[in-house]
Every structure is written in structure tokens, then in C-alpha cells.
Amino acid sequence: MKIFYGPKGTGKTKAIIDYANEAKATAKGHIVYITDSDKYGFELKLPIRFLNTSDFNVKSEDEFRGFIKGIVASNGDNEYVFIDGVARICNKLLSEVGSIFDTMADLEKEFGVKFVLTCSGTKEDLPDFILKYVD
């Protein structure tokens, strides 16, 4: 798992989009990019699959957990899943989404998919369950 973090407005979304576009060049599997807005969808290069959680009425932690499990289950060729704003998507504080990170860690281990996420906050603000993934 890879985490892009920093306070709001510090370029996390641009960094994760750039990373997704760079991963496309070497990825052997499919790439999925998930967020809750259409704002940056056109900045992703094809064939990266762009998913807006608002289109699927995902508004809670449990719904998002099911959403990411479904993405992994529906396509065994998914290599990367990029998530921009995991806490925002779940309508939770960052400190409250530990079970989502547990789910992603389990999916990485069991299915070999790589999760790349953005988290808003300084390094000091990040909960321990996220800090262990920070470079």
C-alpha cells in the first residue's frame, strides 16, 4: 500500500493521478481509479478505469468496503486500485477508517492487488494504521 498525504491543497490528487498515469506504462494488469467527483477524470490516461463513487451512491464505510471488494472480485486482472480521498468517500474522519485499511491489506495479501491512496493531514496527524504504510 502506498499513501500520498499532506494538508488539503498540497497536491495529493495531482500526485496520485501522475502516479497512476506512470503506472500505466509498466502495469501488466488493469488499473482502477476511484474518487467521489468527476473533476479530474479526464486527466487519467486510457485505459485506466475511472469510477466516481457518487455514481454508485456509495456514502458510508460499509458501502465503500463492499465497493472495493466488488472491484477486486469482479476482475482478477486488476493490478492497481487508486483511491483519492478514502475518508471523504466514507464520510468519516481519517482516524475512523481503520477497518477499510484492514480490508485493503487483506485484499493485497490475498489477491495481489496494490492500493494507492490519498489521505489529508500532516504526518503527525496520520493514525498508526496509516503510518505503517508511509515512506
Task: For each feature predicted by the language model, list its residue ranges.
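Conserved catalytic network of the ASCE P-loop NTPase/AAA+ motor domain
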Residues: A23-A27, E43, A73-N75, D106-K114
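Conserved P-loop
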Residues: M1-G70, L126-D128
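N-terminal targeting/trafficking signals and adjacent low-complexity tails
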Residues: S74-D77, G98-S99
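Flexible phosphate-sensing "switch/lid" loops adjacent to ATP/NTP-binding sites
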Residues: G70, D77, A87-C90
